[in-house]
Amino acid sequence: MSDQPRGALLPKKWNENRSLRDYFDGAVFFAALLIVAFRWEVVGCLVYLGIVGAVLVLSDRISDAFLPLILMTVFVTRCYDSFDVFIRYIPFYAVVLLCVAFHLIYYFKKPTFGTSFPGLVAVTVALTLGGIGSLSAAAYFRPMNLYYVLGLGIMMPILYVVAKPRADAEARDRFTRALFLAGCLAAFAVAIFYARGWNEFRETYHALSFQSSNNLATFLMISLPIGFRYSKKARAWIFIPVLQYLALLFCDSRGGTIFGTLEFFALLVFFCFYRSDRFRRICFIAIALLIVVLAVALLPRVLTFYRYDEKIPHFSELTFRQLLRAAFTSVVDNGEARVGLLKRSFADFKSNPLFGVGLGYTGNEDLYHPVKGAMNWYHMWLPQIWGSLGIVGLLCFGYQLFLRIKLAFTRREFPEVTLSLCYAGLLLMSQVNPGEFCPFPYALIATSIFILIEPPQKVGTTEPEETAPEEPETAE
């Protein structure tokens, strides 16, 4: 096999003319809006997978496949409990996998290795050993358990080996844009849901519940920092993250509301002082003050929106101070499944401290029964680690997190800082949801973020290449 990668099968004009790729991305995003608006998720999934397969065959740039792949994961979140629907298309998925194999072979590049790779290997070891001494062989080798063990484990180092040699500045920028558009699509999906349920909403003014709320909130939290970054180039972008935050509040996701608010205000403070001009500082401060004033002035209505009038006795008779106290004290319901799963995670850890009970453990189905095709999550990142993977899992995931944090603080250029903040949003949401324990898309997104944050490496080594410093992003 030649050391030099082959050129793309597409005409040279595709690689030379960036505007063509921009038109492609625009068409893919507009089509995704139509899919969400008209509920064409199943057909859309097949079409977008077909686009991904075709792109991987025709283009030597893996970044060309980012947008259709990530947008597809946004709109299919609305297909809750649809394992039996999608499993029928296995032959089609096999064709897409052949396209992936073709891309890896035909456009082969020598692997390079950077800071985050050892963490992926460590986590793979923990996932592979998880449940030893507790989980039966039959349970360990169940297809669903293998999907999660391999998908979260060995597939991530493989993704690294494949993607790292292709991780240049353009790939980073296109991935960033794909995450941003995914957040915009998620916000649009929330708006469409409320448009369809407007009559129901007007009856109670309670937040509407829908199954994809946590997933849409996760994509919004991943995307939030990017709108702030784009506002540095054009002032009109300042209000995009505000609209995404409003969509987040309407998701009826408790984790999204709490952690999303924490993230949003942290981003306001950060971008107020990080390479910001006077106009943006004034805007960010005004936005923060406006939200706080509205939240305080409309507290009873806000609590009614989140159904606290149903949770808090004598809601209408309480004073403002009592309402505020009741809102904070009733965030966690001691009777909900997460509280039971948290307690159970300690018991599971004690039963097998070294390796945990494994990802394939089903002993918690009395507290949480997953949909077909999903594992028995604890729905919390840390309990998932110590309950499923024990001490080994804590050490390996802790090592990976240490490497990621170290890398994030080392890479201080604006594009890399933005992606680090995107990961922070995902990590926050993972504390109260499966999050990073979903191989596709969240673990894939997390791994890709740190591949793209790392500096380019010399082929076959862990030594960084010497690259010219990027021009700073300037405000218009």
Predicted ranges, named:
Residues 3-6, 12-106, 133-137, 426:
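N-terminal signal-anchor transmembrane segment
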Residues 30, 54, 264, 418-476:
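Transmembrane alpha-helices of multi-pass inner-membrane enzymes
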Residues 34-45, 84-88, 143-146, 211-214, ...:
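Helix-loop-helix junctions and helix-breaking kinks within/between transmembrane helices
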Residues 89-100, 117-132, 140-163:
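Aromatic-anchored transmembrane helix interface
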Residues 131, 157-161, 170-200, 210-274:
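Alpha-helical transmembrane segments of multi-pass inner-membrane proteins
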Residues 194, 246, 250-251, 274-326, ...:
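A membrane-periplasm/extracellular boundary helix in multi-pass inner-membrane enzymes
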Residues 202, 207, 327-389:
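Long extracytoplasmic/lumenal interhelical loops at the membrane interface
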Residues 234-236, 273, 279, 367, ...:
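Hydrophobic transmembrane alpha-helices and their immediate junctions
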